[in-house]
Swiss-Prot record:
The keyword Transcription applies. This is Transcription factor ILI5. It comes from Oryza sativa subsp. japonica. Residues 1-54 form the bHLH domain. GO terms for biological process: brassinosteroid mediated signaling pathway; positive regulation of unidimensional cell growth; regulation of brassinosteroid mediated signaling pathway; regulation of DNA-templated transcription; regulation of leaf development; regulation of seed growth; response to absence of light; response to brassinosteroid. Disruption phenotype: Erected leaves with reduced lamina angles associated with lower cells length, reduced internode length and small spikelets and grains. Impaired response to brassinolide (BL). The lineage of its organism: Eukaryota, Viridiplantae, Streptophyta, Embryophyta, Tracheophyta. Atypical and probable non DNA-binding bHLH transcription factor that acts as a positive regulator of grain size. Involved in the brassinosteroid (BR) signaling pathway. Binds the transcription repressor APG and forms a heterodimer of antagonistic basic helix-loop-helix transcription factors that regulates grain length and weight by controlling cell elongation in lemma and palea. Contributes, together with LO9-177 and BC1, to the promotion of leaf inclination and grain size by modulating cell elongation. InterPro entries: bHLH_dom, HLH_DNA-bd_sf, PRE. One of its GO terms (cellular component) is nucleus. The keyword Nucleus applies. One of its GO terms (molecular function) is identical protein binding. The gene is ILI5. Expressed in seedlings, lamina joints, nodes, roots, and floral organs including anthers, young panicles, pistil, lemma and palea. Expressed at low levels in leaves. Preferentially present in leaves lamina joints.
Protein backbone atom coordinates (compact mmCIF):
# COMPACT_ATOMS: atom_id res chain seq x y z
CA UNK A 1 0.00 0.00 0.00
CA UNK A 2 2.82 2.41 0.78
CA UNK A 3 4.10 2.09 -2.79
CA UNK A 4 0.98 3.90 -4.00
CA UNK A 5 1.38 6.83 -1.64
CA UNK A 6 2.56 10.10 -3.02
CA UNK A 7 5.92 11.58 -2.12
CA UNK A 8 4.14 13.66 0.57
CA UNK A 9 3.17 10.45 2.36
CA UNK A 10 -0.54 11.15 2.04
CA UNK A 11 -3.15 8.64 0.97
CA UNK A 12 -4.18 8.83 -2.67
CA UNK A 13 -7.77 9.26 -3.77
CA UNK A 14 -7.61 5.76 -5.25
CA UNK A 15 -6.61 4.31 -1.86
CA UNK A 16 -9.42 6.19 -0.15
CA UNK A 17 -11.91 4.83 -2.67
CA UNK A 18 -10.60 1.30 -2.11
CA UNK A 19 -10.91 1.68 1.67
CA UNK A 20 -14.43 3.08 1.35
CA UNK A 21 -15.37 0.17 -0.88
CA UNK A 22 -13.95 -2.34 1.62
CA UNK A 23 -15.77 -0.64 4.46
CA UNK A 24 -19.00 -0.70 2.50
CA UNK A 25 -18.63 -4.43 1.87
CA UNK A 26 -18.44 -5.05 5.63
CA UNK A 27 -21.78 -3.43 6.38
CA UNK A 28 -24.91 -5.56 6.19
CA UNK A 29 -27.51 -4.41 3.66
CA UNK A 30 -25.05 -2.00 2.12
CA UNK A 31 -25.97 -0.74 -1.32
CA UNK A 32 -23.61 0.48 -4.02
CA UNK A 33 -23.23 4.22 -4.03
CA UNK A 34 -21.29 6.75 -5.99
CA UNK A 35 -18.04 8.09 -4.64
CA UNK A 36 -19.39 11.53 -3.80
CA UNK A 37 -18.57 13.20 -0.50
CA UNK A 38 -22.20 12.93 0.61
CA UNK A 39 -22.18 9.17 0.01
CA UNK A 40 -18.91 8.78 1.89
CA UNK A 41 -20.27 10.78 4.80
CA UNK A 42 -23.43 8.68 4.83
CA UNK A 43 -21.39 5.48 4.71
CA UNK A 44 -19.27 6.60 7.66
CA UNK A 45 -22.39 7.48 9.65
CA UNK A 46 -23.90 4.08 8.83
CA UNK A 47 -20.67 2.43 9.94
CA UNK A 48 -20.72 4.27 13.26
CA UNK A 49 -24.37 3.35 13.80
CA UNK A 50 -23.64 -0.29 12.97
CA UNK A 51 -20.74 -0.39 15.42
CA UNK A 52 -22.95 1.15 18.11
CA UNK A 53 -25.63 -1.47 17.44
CA UNK A 54 -23.02 -4.22 17.74
CA UNK A 55 -21.92 -2.79 21.09
CA UNK A 56 -25.54 -2.79 22.30
CA UNK A 57 -25.95 -6.38 21.14
CA UNK A 58 -22.79 -7.47 22.96
CA UNK A 59 -23.94 -5.69 26.12
CA UNK A 60 -27.35 -7.37 25.89
CA UNK A 61 -25.83 -10.80 25.37
CA UNK A 62 -23.43 -10.22 28.25
CA UNK A 63 -26.31 -9.27 30.54
CA UNK A 64 -28.30 -12.31 29.48
CA UNK A 65 -25.31 -14.58 30.05
CA UNK A 66 -24.73 -13.06 33.50
CA UNK A 67 -28.38 -13.61 34.39
CA UNK A 68 -28.20 -17.20 33.18
CA UNK A 69 -25.01 -17.91 35.10
CA UNK A 70 -26.51 -16.39 38.27
CA UNK A 71 -29.39 -18.86 38.17
CA UNK A 72 -27.30 -21.95 37.39
CA UNK A 73 -25.60 -24.35 39.72
CA UNK A 74 -21.92 -23.56 39.14
CA UNK A 75 -21.08 -27.27 39.20
CA UNK A 76 -23.72 -28.27 36.65
CA UNK A 77 -22.83 -29.61 33.22
CA UNK A 78 -24.50 -26.55 31.64
CA UNK A 79 -22.29 -24.19 33.60
CA UNK A 80 -19.22 -26.16 32.57
CA UNK A 81 -20.26 -25.97 28.91
CA UNK A 82 -20.66 -22.19 29.16
CA UNK A 83 -17.27 -21.84 30.85
CA UNK A 84 -15.61 -23.93 28.14
CA UNK A 85 -17.22 -21.81 25.41
CA UNK A 86 -16.03 -18.62 27.09
CA UNK A 87 -12.48 -19.98 27.32
CA UNK A 88 -12.29 -20.67 23.58
Amino acid sequence: MSSRRSSRGSISEEEINELISKLQSLLPNSRRRGSSQASTTKLLKETCNYIKSLHREVDDLSDRLSDLMATMDHNSPGAEIIRSILRS
